[in-house]
Amino acid sequence: MDYKERLIQEQKELKEKCEKLQIMLDKYISGTLDFTPNCSYDLLHEQYIYMMNYLSVLSYRIKMEVK
């Protein structure tokens, strides 16, 4: 697998993780999580923001690198 394929794979995996974290955050707010997190909503939300920013950068890189 070359670096372009790895970029695309990383983007796919990160997108899935972002989607799952968003679902978790929605459940956290609505009080429907099936477990009690040890960290705050704010910390998880901050993680989500950083992950989404990284996804944006990664997507831009892919547009530039993969043609």
Regions found by a protein language model. Give the residues of each.
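Extended, charge-rich alpha-helical interface modules
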Residues: 1-67
